[in-house]
Curated annotation (Swiss-Prot):
Keyword set, alphabetical order: Cytoplasm, Repeat, WD repeat
Encoding gene per record: sur-6
Cytoplasm among keywords: yes
Family under the similarity heading: Belongs to the phosphatase 2A regulatory subunit B family.
Subcellular location, record wording: Cytoplasm
Name this polypeptide is given: Serine/threonine-protein phosphatase 2A regulatory subunit sur-6
WD repeat spans: 64-103, 130-171, 215-253, 264-304, 323-361, 378-419, 464-495
Effect of residue 302 to Y: In ku123; viable with no visible phenotype. Suppresses multivulva formation in a let-60 n1046 mutant background
Organism field: Caenorhabditis elegans
């Protein structure tokens, strides 16, 4: 049951019919804790990635559609890495616990920790629609005790899972009665024994704790846990709902952009996320390229945003594809809460929360595809939704592309952006960067100081659009990245 509330949750400082006036008063106070000092960003050096691991069968012909990875997410401390796939399964990896060190740092290998079936295929008999088991997103809750908790969602249903360990049991020789079906009265004679606890092989159990359903008419595209660790939001194409983790049968509708007449629909919600420290703030992005920042203290139904971030369109460059490639596929707050990172089809942008008119940084991802938009439209690749990520220190940016290529950017150093290809090679060996050129006419080799080739040309005509990196994750503390390439999970680091 979704509760639509029109009354203000908290008394607002301005009238509800004056959202623009309120928006002018909504300024980020950089003197408070959540938003760090207003610094001029210093350029940083590019990271040279090294291959660590690849999970899954690397034979391109040996996988099913259910094996395709659909989401990747590190835990808050980086000790665990969760993936979901189109078959409804969740696989959790744990960082190596053996104490092994590589080049003076703790091993950055991840091993399988737990695998379980999160969602099953369903059928909506009321609408005669099949509901896929595909996992759309996974979000970790902050660890409070020995157990871990994650939220996972498919198109309709969100589930809370508890991941716990069991490595001790009651010893078989510590019973006062024989462990048989028949009771022998003579067995009661003798001394009373106290059961003893003995070690056993580690068992990791995943148990469902809550199921949040029946609140979304359209497909859920985002979930985000609030900084208070008590509530979370879920977003579909037209609505954003607020949930309490302890309550499964009701949620509060906090954004509703559905028009009275669906023929007047001009945009849909593509992603939503809570601020990392301010529990009242959240953002949601749209298919028209705008990002809206909302404050739940203003009103319960946040249809009137506090700020809107959008870049004016150049009329000279407008085409049939302009609105499609402007659609924001992912939005992420920086760890310090000061910036927003957004990804559209061709670029990654960094927005300052204090400047709505234009991004402070724009990084091209694959501009060489601009001349191929017609072909990409015909094969539906233009609708692919790429994710983006911040590094733990907010100084680097990560996103994916086609042909299993990915790009990382050193902020403030746009000229030093490099492209790498996710492919198996020797552990801890440096990746060779790729340079995509419009045609295969030009070849160049850049040599490292050791004389090894570090860059390879790749013609844009050779790109394989069915091999793509849509889902990415960056370790919250170390320079470790995880990339989903079809059914493979690649892990790279700077060591």
């Amino acid at each position: 049951m979704v509760m639509e509330v029109d009354e203000p949750a908290v008394a607002a400082t301005t009238s509800q019919n004056q959202p623009q006036e309120h928006a002018n008063d909504f300024d980020m106070d950089t003197s408070e804790g959540p938003i760090e000092n207003d610094e001029t960003f210093e350029p940083v050096d590019q990271i040279n990635w090294k291959f660590n691991q690849v999970k899954g069968n690397i034979d391109a012909d040996v996988h099913t559609e259910a094996d395709v990875i659909s989401c990747v997410e590190f835990s808050h401390d980086g000790e665990y890495l969760a993936t979901g796939d189109k078959g409804g399964r969740v696989v959790i990896f744990q960082r190596d616990q053996s104490g092994k060190y590589v080049k003076g740092v703790r091993s950055r290998e991840y091993n399988v920790y737990s695998t379980f079936q999160s969602h099953e295929p369903e059928f909506d008999y009321l609408k005669s629609l099949e509901i896929d088991e595909k996992i759309n997103q996974i979000r970790w809750l902050k660890k409070k005790n020995a157990a871990n908790f994650i939220l996972s969602t498919n198109d309709k249903t969100i589930k809370l899972w508890k991941i716990s360990e069991r490595e001790r049991k009651i010893g078989d020789d510590a019973w006062n009665l024989p462990r048989t079906n028949r009771i022998n009265t003579s067995s009661f004679r003798g001394r009373l024994q106290i059961p003893s606890i003995v070690p056993m092989e580690l068992i990791v159990e995943a148990s469902p704790r809550r199921v949040y359903g029946n609140a979304h008419t359209y497909h859920v595209n985002s979930i985000s846990v609030n900084s208070d660790q008590e509530t979370f939001l879920s977003a579909d194409d037209l609505r954003v709902n607020l949930w309490n983790l302890e309550i499964t049968n009701e949620s509060f509708n906090i954004v509703d952009i559905k028009p009275a007449n669906m023929e007047e629909l001009t945009e849909v919600i593509t992603a939503a996320e809570f601020h990392p420290t301010q529990c009242n703030w959240f953002v949601y992005s749209s298919s028209k390229g705008s990002i809206r920042l909302c404050d739940m203290r203003d009103r319960a139904l946040c249809d009137a945003y506090a700020k809107i971030f959008e870049e004016p369109e150049d009329p000279q460059s407008r085409s049939f594809f302009s609105e499609i490639i402007a659609s924001v596929s992912d939005v992420k707050f920086s760890h310090n809460g000061r910036y927003l990172l957004t990804r559209d089809y061709l670029t990654v942008k960094v927005w300052d929360l204090n400047m709505e008119s234009q991004p402070v940084e724009t990084y091209p991802v694959h501009n060489y595809l601009r001349t191929k938009l017609c072909a990409l439209y015909e094969n539906d690749s233009i609708f692919d939704k790429f994710e983006c990520d911040w590094s733990g220190d907010d100084k680097h940016i990560l996103t994916g592309s086609y042909h299993n290529l990915f790009r990382s950017y050193a902020r403030g150093n746009n000229q030093d952006a490099k492209t790498w290809e996710a492919r198996p090679q020797e552990p801890h060996s440096q990746l060779r960067s790729r340079f995509v050129v419009p045609s295969a006419k030009r070849k160049r080799n850049n040599l490292s100081s050791s004389g090894e080739t570090t860059e390879e040309d790749l013609s844009s005509d050779q790109l394989q659009f069915d091999r793509k990196i849509l889902h990415t994750a960056w370790h919250p503390k170390d320079n470790i990245i995880a990339l989903a390439a079809t059914n493979n999970l690649y892990i790279f680091s700077d060591v």
